[in-house]
Structure formats: structure tokens, C-alpha cells
């Protein structure tokens, strides 16, 4: 299995995140990438390549032109106002307010953001494009005949909607990869999101389509970010009715219960019979993750990697979350080695 990665991820390095009423060091940090690379080397998965140039036309199939323009100019507009800190939204278009994009940067940030924890810095746009290029390049490896590949994306992407950023995400790498598979001849693609947090952005992008099935195992939205999507009655709309499947699970969920949901998802994927499978790989289901509440052990990640392999489908792993930094390498690579041994 080849890994695609880029050290340009370091260009996105926010210094602060609002959590618990305090400004803290962001949980989504460059060290996450370092620990994963180190563990890949330790187990011998050292076949790595840099991404090719990003095909922006592919990104434009996933995100709206206005949103992409905003991301490309947000930092320059913010800094032109003389602000010294990172660009963080402070006002949002709440219920019964106009859904019109303002001109002033503070309003634009709130218009496109879903939460306050995700800062834009001087290098965010470049890092987000590089992360998308990592996903695109890995997708092309699989489209060209590789049985599997790992896109070590940072920043992550599954919370980014067609015109929405937040949850540490700017461009939806998994959705870009799924769209790339379709462009390369796939008739159907499944996206399985095993991150602790619901992949609201991916659901948003494909909700009315039947050529991409989206399935997500996540903390119940009553208790877990992003709170406002991820319920079982969200099953798709129009042409996409029946092709969106959510598995919200309660606080304290152990692996046995989580794995039952995974088995059901895998059965649905097998019945759908996609030409390619994208795994939104978040390992924040780990018991010691600081912003999650599932109880998976490190060995459990190996076990479910094997279960995914039993589908025997061309499979692309796209890195998402995981914030127990010292264990992120072990847990991520356990999924990959479990898959390869399956």
C-alpha cells in the first residue's frame, strides 16, 4: 500500500482554539501527521509519494465557486483589516436572519463557517489545497489499478460541505476522491466514515445522489459535535433517498457495539456493490481521545481493518481525525495493517 503525503500540511498551524471557554492549543496539530509517518516507518509501510498538482476543476465539482473564492482570499482580506490574530468567526446567520454573504470579512467568516474552533491562517488555503491533492493523487493510484492506497491528508476534510468549513476542515478530501473515482469511470462509490464525529460535509455533498452511498458511524448528535446532523432519519433526498445511512452511538460505546454497526454498514456496502470504497479514517474513536467518548482499544483498529478488507474492493483510506496524538500513529497504522493482513 502506497501512502501519499505532503509536508505542506505544516503551512496550516493555528496557535489557538476556543474550547471550554478558553483559548487552548488546537487539538488538530501538525504533530498528528508526524506520529503517523513515524509509525508507518516502524512497520515497514515506507512506500511514499508526493501528490501531483491539484486539479481545481475536480474541487469545483464538490465545492461552490463562491466558497472557493472565499477560502482563497479570506486571509488576505482579514490581514488587510489590520487584525493581528488568526481569522475566527464571531457572528453567524442564525434562524430568521438573511442568508446573504456580507462584504466585510467578519461577516464572510460567519457566513461560511459552522463553528468557531477552526481558524484560518496565512497558510491555510495552500495547506488545504495540498491536502486535497493528496486525496486526488491517492485516488488516481487506485483508479489506475492499485488495490488500496492511503491519503495522509491534513487538514482533514469530512466536515467541509459544499459551501461550509469547520471542524478543522476546509476542503472535503473524501468527497473529492469519490468524485475523482466517478470521473475515472466508476459508476458507484461508497464512502464509509469511521471517524468519531459525523461526516456532515460529506453527507451534505452527496445527499441527493445515488452514485455515492454515504455511511457514517459516529457519536450521537444529541451529545457530540457537530450536533445538528447525523440522525438515523437522514436517509437521503430525491434521487439519493436510501443512499445515506447514519449510525449514531451513545457515550461510552464499546467496540462490540460499535462493530455491530460496522458490520451492518459493510453489508449495505456489499449490497450496493460500488466500484470503489473510500474510508474516511478518523481514529478519534480511541478510548483516550480528548474530545470523543467511544472506548475502542488499539487492537480494535486492527480488527476492523480486517473486516473492511473482507469486502475485497478497491479501497482508499483518507485521513480524518484523531486527537490522542501519541497514539494516533499506532491506531491509524493498525487499521492499515489489519486491512493488508485481512
What are these regions (language model features)?
Residues 1-192, 197-342:
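HDAC/HDAC-like amidohydrolase catalytic core signature
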Amino acid at each position: 500500500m502506497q501512502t501519499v503525503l505532503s509536508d505542506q500540511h505544516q503551512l496550516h498551524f493555528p496557535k489557538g482554539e476556543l474550547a471550554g471557554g478558553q483559548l487552548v492549543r488546537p487539538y488538530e496539530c501538525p504533530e498528528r501527521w508526524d506520529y503517523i509517518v513515524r509509525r508507518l516507518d516502524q512497520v515497514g509501510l515506507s512506500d511514499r509519494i508526493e501528490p501531483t498538482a491539484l486539479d481545481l476543476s475536480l474541487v469545483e465539482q464538490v465545492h461552490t465557486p463562491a466558497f472557493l473564492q472565499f477560502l482563497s482570499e479570506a486571509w488576505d482580506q482579514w490581514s488587510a483589516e489590520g487584525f493581528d490574530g488568526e481569522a475566527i468567526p464571531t457572528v453567524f446567520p442564525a434562524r430568521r436572519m438573511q442568508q446573504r454573504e456580507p462584504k466585510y470579512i467578519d461577516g464572510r467568516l460567519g457566513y461560511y463557517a459552522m463553528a468557531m474552533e477552526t481558524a484560518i491562517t496565512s497558510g491555510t488555503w495552500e495547506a488545504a489545497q495540498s491536502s486535497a491533492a493528496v486525496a486526488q493523487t491517492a485516488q488516481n493510484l487506485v483508479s489506475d489499478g492499485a488495490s488500496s492506497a492511503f491519503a495522509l491528508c491534513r487538514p482533514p476534510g469530512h466536515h467541509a460541505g459544499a459551501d461550509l468549513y469547520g471542524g478543522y476542515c476546509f476542503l472535503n478530501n473524501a468527497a473529492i476522491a469519490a468524485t475523482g473515482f466517478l470521473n475515472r469511470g466508476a459508476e458507484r462509490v461508497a464512502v464509509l466514515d469511521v471517524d468519531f464525529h459525523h461526516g456532515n460535509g460529506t453527507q451534505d455533498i452527496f445527499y441527493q445522489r445515488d452514485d455515492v452511498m454515504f455511511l457514517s458511524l459516529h457519536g450521537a448528535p444529541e451529545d457530540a459535535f457537530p450536533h445538528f446532523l447525523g440522525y438515523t432519519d437522514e436517509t437521503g433526498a430525491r434521487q439519493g433517498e436510501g443512499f445515506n445511512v447514519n449510525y449514531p452511538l451513545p457515550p461510552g460505546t464499546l467496540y462490540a457495539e460499535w462493530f455491530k454497526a460496522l458490520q451492518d454498514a459493510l453489508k449495505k456496502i456489499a449490497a450496493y456493490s460500488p466500484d470503489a470504497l473510500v474510508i474516511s479514517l478518523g481514529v478519534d474513536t480511541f478510548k483516550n481521545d480528548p474530545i470523543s467518548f467511544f472506548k475502542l482499544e488499539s487492537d480494535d483498529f486492527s480488527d476492523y481493518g480486517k473486516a473492511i478488507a473482507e469486502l475485497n474492493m478497491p479501497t482508499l483510506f483518507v485521513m480524518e481525525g484523531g486527537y490522542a496524538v501519541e497514539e494516533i500513529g499506532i491506531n491509524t497504522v493498525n487499521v492499515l495493517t489489519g486491512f493488508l493482513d485481512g
